[in-house]
A protein has these predicted regions:
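Extracellular beta-strand scaffolds
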Residues: 1-4, 8-15, 20-24, 28-34, ...
């Protein structure tokens, strides 16, 4: 292997190409810095006035220092990229591509423009990643325990996506097969989610419209909210938290059940279009509330309330608890209606 330290190019580039492992401690170039090796380890501080590019056929290890480019910063590894107590900074874009990428709690990635992280296997983030424009993270398994911030768009895409940290963008898109959120997923504008199964005890929210598509199960004990309209489409919904769309709420599902302490609310209109509905807790709308179901049941402690009109259409309606409307209430049960409220 090649072990180098304190490399300086005051009037040009630094180019390093090793057939074996390459280890460099401290480098400075007014131009570009390029490092290639069978494996690459960088310690200390590395600064490029131009692009900074590191590529390895195996692993890249970054520890206890900084990588700083006035232009683009690019890391490409055939194996793993490891970031330990390391700060990456780019005047333009940052790109990380590897089979596995890990970032510890003491590390940061900052770019004036875009940040793209692509892991063909696992991506684990525990530190802070901040993009002046767009942030994109994709992996087969993405475990996000840190802070991801984008001043423009943030997009996460993974087969398995686990978030216990904070993700925030001016707009936010989430794509996965299974998604678990015990942290926060926030958008300053619209939020779009497309997944099979979504489990959350944290907070998912947007100032703009929220569109959620869960082809399997959605289970929430946390907050799922929009200051604008919220549209939720799922196979099965278990709602034991807060589900709210300030300017409208629409839920379409095969089954919907809400728990005793749940709040399902819109300041505007609400439509529940569900085959089988079992409601407890609070279900309320400032405007018209419509429930369209094959089978509807409300528990003794359930509150079904509308600031204007309440419309219930079902084949089988079994109503307990409170049903109330400020204006008109219409209950249409084509086969069976029981009321014990």
């Amino acid at each position: 292997g090649v072990n180098l330290g304190n490399l300086y190019a005051r009037d040009g580039d630094i180019t390093l190409d090793a057939s074996g492992r390459l280890t460099v401690n401290n480098s400075l170039a007014t131009g570009a810095v390029t490092a290639k090796g069978q494996g690459v380890t960088l310690t200390g501080d590395h600064k490029a006035g131009g692009n900074l590019s590191v590529s390895s056929r195996r692993d890249i290890v970054l520890s206890n220092g900084t990588l700083n480019s006035d232009k683009d910063l690019s890391l490409t590894a055939g194996g793993r990229i490891t970031q330990q107590n390391e700060k990456l900074t780019a005047g333009r874009d940052v790109t990380l591509a590897a089979k596995n990428i890990t970032q510890d709690t003491a590390s940061q990635i900052n770019a004036a423009r875009d940040i793209v992280t692509v892991a063909s296997d696992t991506l684990t983030t525990q530190g802070q990643i901040t993009a002046g424009q767009n942030l994109t993270a994709s992996a087969t398994t993405l475990t996000q325990d840190g802070i991801l911030l984008a001043k423009s768009h943030a997009g996460l895409n993974a087969g398995t996506l686990n978030n216990s940290g904070a993700v925030q963008g001016a707009t936010l898109t989430l794509g996965s097969t299974t998604l678990s959120n015990s942290g926060s997923l926030l958008s300053g504008g619209p939020l779009t989610m497309n997944t099979r199964d979504f489990t959350q005890s944290g907070r998912t929210g947007a100032k703009g419209k929220v569109d959620i598509m869960a082809s399997g199960k959605l289970t929430s004990t946390g907050l799922l909210v929009s200051d604008d309209a919220l549209v939720l489409k799922a196979q099965d919904v278990t709602q034991n938290g807060v589900l709210s769309g300030g300017k409208g709420l629409t839920v379409s599902a095969q089954t919907l059940s809400s728990g005793k302490k749940s709040v399902t609310h819109s300041d505007a209109a609400m439509t529940l279009n569900v085959t089988t509905v079992a409601l407890d807790g609070e279900t309320s709308a400032g405007d018209t509330l419509r429930v369209q179901a094959d089978k509807l049941s409300t528990a003794a402690g359930a509150q079904l309330q509308s600031g204007k009109n309440l419309s219930i259409n079902a084949r089988d309606a079994r109503l307990a608890g409170t049903q109330a409307a400020q204006q008109t209430m219409v209950v249409n049960a084509s086969e069976k209606l029981t009321h014990s409220g």
